[in-house]
Structures are given as structure tokens and as C-alpha cells.
Amino acid sequence: MPVLEVQGLCKTYPKFRLENISFMLEKGRIMGLIGRNGAGKTTTLKSLLNLVHPDCGKRTFFGLDLESHEQEIKCRIGYAGGAVDYYHRKKIRLLADVTKQFYPNWDETAYRKYLNVFSLDEQKTPSELSEGMRVKLSLTLALSHHAELLILDEPTSGLDPVSRAELLDIFTVLRNQGTAILFSTHITTDLEACADDVTYLAAGKMIASEPMEAFLKRGPSLQEIMVQYEKENLREKLAE
């Protein structure tokens, strides 16, 4: 049984449409969601969790439909997005105390472990943190309740190379423990270092969703595959 199955996800805005996105993610696998800026990655991730309400489509987590089991599902998921709205002048300790009330499986030992791993001072406020450290705070809160699935929007954005490498190592450890991870990124080398599967979006449409090994048969690297596709797409538009 897949940890996550998405069927026919659609969302329309005045100048953008997410069209018929379908993919599945198994336990203990990492899926990278790639695409250029504006491709629909963030809309897809937010639609999975009803942070954006899709126009159509079915989202199933752990065999449960999101529409009828949303609260139960969200207790089993960790989410971190680049635009998480914190109380910027409240101390991290207070944010953790508020967050843990929503998760029966909150683990204070795990919370303190990730504070140490990410060198976070819980007496500081988010307003005192750099962009990269705020990403680490998001991940600390997401990882502290033993989520079975992590959904992460650009988690390596703003991190220095050493911190990115450390985070990818953590992803690998979590995968080996059975956690499924879905994360968007424009840093394709991060995916090549740890992802099992790739879903590629372009202009709101799904171009491919398949194992990394199969996807890389299209070209020498994720970046080269994306650049080649986008170039061909541009040529077709110019020829119209």
C-alpha cells in the first residue's frame, strides 16, 4: 500500500493551471519534485494538504482519503514549507510547546536531538534566525513527532553546502528507517544524491513520474534533462 497516492489533481488560478497530476510514493522512499520556478511544485504540495484547496483530484494517505480522514492523516505527516508563518518574536521553545499539542506522537527527546543537530538555540526567536536556520527550525518541528511521511517545500533552500549535505544524510537515515519523503527543489544535485523517484512538472503539467534510474535514461543528469525539455518546449512555442 502506498504511503501517498495522488490521482488527477487540478487547481486553476487566473493565470495558471495545475493539470491532472498523478503519482504515488511508497514507504521508505524519497521522491524529488522538480521543475523550474512557476511549474506548480508548491501548488502541488499545498494541494496535498488542503493548504490550497484543489478543484479536483483524489489524495490518499496510508490508504485513507484526505477528505474524510484529514486530522488523522495530518498527525502522521511532517510538513515544512519555505513560507511557514511563525510568530516571529516568540521563542522557539514556545513554538515547540504549541506545536506538540497537535501531535500525540511528539517526542521531546527527538526534538532536543534535532535542536542539537541543527545548532538551534530554543531561547531565540525566528526573527533572530537566518533564512537557512529558519528552514532548520521548520524541519526540527516536522521531525519531532515521528512522522511517517515528510512533505517538504524547498528544504535545502538557503542552506550552505555543508548544511545541505548534513540534511541529505538525515534524509537517507530516515528513509532507511522507513520514512517516506517528498520534497521539492531546484537544486537537482541534491536529488541525485538521495532520491529514489522523480516527478517532473513543467507549466502545471506532469512530464514524468518514475524511479530515478529510469528518469536518468533520458539524459546525463537531471539538470540536463530539464534544460533540454524546456529548450524544446520554447522552440515549439516560438514556431507556433
Residue ranges and their predicted role:
Residues V6-L9, F16-E26, G57:
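Conserved beta-strand
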Residues G57-S68, E72-I73:
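Conserved ABC transporter NBD signature motif
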Residues L137-L139, L159:
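Hydrophobic anchor residue at the start of the ABC signature
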Residues I34-R36:
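The feature captures the beta-strand-to-loop junction immediately N-terminal to the Walker
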Residues C75, G81-L137:
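ABC-family P-loop ATPase nucleotide-binding domains
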Residues R164-Q177:
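Helical segment within the ABC ATPase nucleotide-binding domain
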